[in-house]
């Protein structure tokens, strides 16, 4: 069992990583006998995990209710979040309740925002079941729902009480979802850790095959890196946490334009990271060889390295200008400056953005 702490003073919390955690009551601390919990999950995951988690909690005397939501990015909305509030109110959950997010990034983000909002804030626990949510979205307290005009535009910074990562969940993950998660894994190597990027180049086949030791190390390293960044810049005020958004400004444009769920989040981020690499290459801070290493690693992870055929370069910018990093009308982009290093830049022209996007339309 691995334990990592996200250090935020009185709001610090543990990340627990191991197999078989759903059968261990102590996994779900700080839940205690007599306390209420509302498990939020979706129709795909409920048959797989809901009974296991419910039984483990009920054996400890926890009072368990659940709400089962539809599955998909298109349901990460205020309308669906209202179903969570309805369930909480109908079951008379009060301020000492705990929401338990049992699912991937959509469930985690939506449940976290519901927890931040219900009766002005209740406790919640992240139980991520996808690789993407285990290595990224479950850690750090970013919670949100989507709006038709932009991804994650309505939300709050709200930290969980704990994060529980059961490695056994990956055995039921569809290959496309696994690859989507690997995009966020590769991101960490590009922006923060050259040695980890090299390790990924040498071990990507093991990750695709779900080799247990490789996967455990991979998830632990990603969580360590994310925890360090969140501890130093929780609310993205210094620019450090913004580095975690490599590829996301381009990627969110793809998701919004194509319709949420058509491209998985990691797929859109993968194409976006290539666009960011091409932009950095054009600026002379990333070599062609480094760009090719990124492209080849993404391809080995079965990820796209081009934007959608249906999108033209001019389709991206309106969505990109709604990005949360836009300030004073200027687009702020996270760009690599060598494998393992990155920076946030506000001096990128529209022409340079268009050039990078154009080079990623059926080009690689």
UniProtKB/Swiss-Prot annotation:
Protein name: 3-dehydroquinate synthase
Enzyme class: lyase
Cellular compartment(s): Cytoplasm
Lineage of source species: Bacteria, Pseudomonadati, Pseudomonadota, Gammaproteobacteria, Enterobacterales
GO-annotated molecular function: 3-dehydroquinate synthase activity; metal ion binding; nucleotide binding
Binding residue positions for Zn(2+): 184, 248, 265
Positions annotated to bind NAD(+): 71-76, 105-109, 129-130, 142, 151, 169-172
Highest taxon, organism lineage: Bacteria
Keyword annotations: Amino-acid biosynthesis, Aromatic amino acid biosynthesis, Cobalt, Cytoplasm, Lyase, Metal-binding, NAD, Nucleotide-binding, Zinc
Source organism: Proteus mirabilis (strain HI4320)
């Amino acid at each position: 069992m691995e334990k990592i702490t996200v250090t935020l003073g009185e709001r610090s919390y543990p990340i627990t990583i191991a197999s078989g955690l759903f059968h261990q009551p102590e996994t779900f601390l700080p839940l205690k006998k007599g306390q209420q919990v509302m498990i939020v999950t979706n129709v795909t995951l409920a048959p797989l995990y809901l009974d296991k988690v419910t039984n483990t909690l009920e054996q400890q005397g926890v009072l368990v209710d659940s709400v089962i939501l539809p599955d998909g990015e298109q349901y990460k909305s205020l309308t669906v979040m209202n179903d969570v509030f309805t369930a909480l109110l109908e079951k008379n959950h009060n301020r000492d309740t705990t929401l338990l997010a049992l699912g991937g990034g959509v469930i985690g983000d939506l449940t976290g925002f519901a927890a931040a909002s219900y009766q002005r804030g209740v406790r919640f626990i992240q139980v991520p079941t996808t690789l993407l949510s285990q290595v990224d979205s479950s850690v750090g307290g970013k919670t949100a729902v989507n709006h038709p005009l932009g991804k994650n535009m309505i939300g709050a910074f709200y930290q969980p009480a704990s994060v529980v990562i059961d490695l056994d969940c990956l055995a039921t993950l569809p290959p496309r979802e696994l690859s989507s998660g690997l995009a966020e894994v590769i991101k960490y190597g590009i922006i923060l850790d050259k040695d980890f990027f090299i390790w990924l180049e040498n071990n990507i086949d093991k990750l695709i095959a779900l080799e247990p030791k490789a996967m455990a190390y991979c998830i632990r390293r990603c969580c360590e890196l994310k925890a360090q960044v969140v501890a130093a810049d929780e609310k993205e005020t210094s620019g450090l946490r913004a580095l975690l958004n490599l590829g996301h400004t381009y990627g969110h444009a793809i998701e919004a334009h194509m319709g949420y769920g058509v491209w998985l989040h990691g797929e859109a981020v993968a194409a976006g990271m290539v666009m960011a690499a091409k932009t950095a290459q054009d600026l002379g801070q990333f070599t062609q060889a480094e760009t090719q290493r990124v492209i080849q690693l993404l391809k080995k992870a079965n990820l796209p390295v081009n934007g959608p055929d249906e999108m033209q370069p001019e389709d991206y910018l309106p969505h990109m200008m709604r990005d949360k990093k836009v300030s004073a009308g200027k687009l702020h982009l996270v760009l690599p400056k060598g494998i393992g290093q990155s920076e946030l830049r506000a001096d990128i022209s529209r022409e340079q953005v268009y050039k990078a996007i154009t080079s990623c339309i059926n080009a690689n």
